[in-house]
């Protein structure tokens, strides 16, 4: 029942965003990110959201399949350690970094509401430090925003989702930092169609047809 109702809400949000009703964020800023010497990216556009949803291969593929998404990039977000993020360091645990996908979108084609509803459709918000078969702090779920407009939307959708579950472990907060993942992680499932993915193919196809 939970997933069925989420799908219905998602379809409604996508339809409304196409009519220019649900889009909650301003028009796109053409410049997206700037990369500092450390490898950390600094956000310079409004129409972006950072989604931690378990293994980033699947979340990246899911977001890329949604019409209106301009780009999805795998990386590591909101670390608390002093080290820069890379796969080996993050997998050791204790860094605070989450496998996260940076999603840039065109608000004239898809709303942030719709992207968040797609996100909550495929994750399990009731478990901590785990999604699917993947266990570890790097697989903790989270939604990280970079603007006041996105904050309002994220908190509104999160409140709805919290009301539908007895437990809710999804981190909700501002983006602190983001390091792009290694090149071999980018577009991983495009390069390896039979590679591991914790999101069922049927759900991928559902959103690609919206």
Where are these regions (language model features)?
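Bacterial N-terminal signal peptides
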Residues: 9-18
């Amino acid at each position: 029942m939970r997933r069925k109702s989420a799908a219905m809400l998602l379809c409604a949000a996508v339809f409304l965003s196409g009519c220019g009703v649900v889009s909650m964020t301003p028009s796109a800023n053409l410049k997206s990110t700037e990369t500092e010497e450390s490898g950390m990216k600094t956000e310079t556009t409004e129409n972006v959201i950072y989604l931690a949803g378990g293994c980033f291969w699947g979340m990246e593929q899911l977001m890329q399949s949604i019409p209106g998404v301009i780009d999805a990039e795998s990386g590591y977000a909101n670390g608390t350690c002093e080290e820069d993020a890379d796969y080996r360091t993050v997998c050791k645990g204790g860094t605070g970094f989450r496998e996260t996908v940076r999603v840039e979108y065109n608000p004239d084609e898809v709303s942030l509401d719709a992207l968040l509803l797609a996100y909550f459709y495929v994750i399990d918000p009731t478990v901590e430090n785990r999604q699917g078969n993947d266990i570890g702090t790097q697989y903790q779920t989270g939604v990280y925003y970079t603007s006041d407009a996105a904050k309002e939307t994220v908190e509104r959708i999160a409140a709805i989702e919290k009301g539908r579950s007895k437990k809710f472990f999804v981190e909700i907060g501002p983006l602190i930092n983001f390091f792009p993942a290694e090149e071999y992680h980018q577009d991983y499932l495009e390069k390896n169609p039979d590679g591991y993915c914790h999101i069922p193919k049927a759900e991928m196809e559902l959103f690609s047809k919206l």
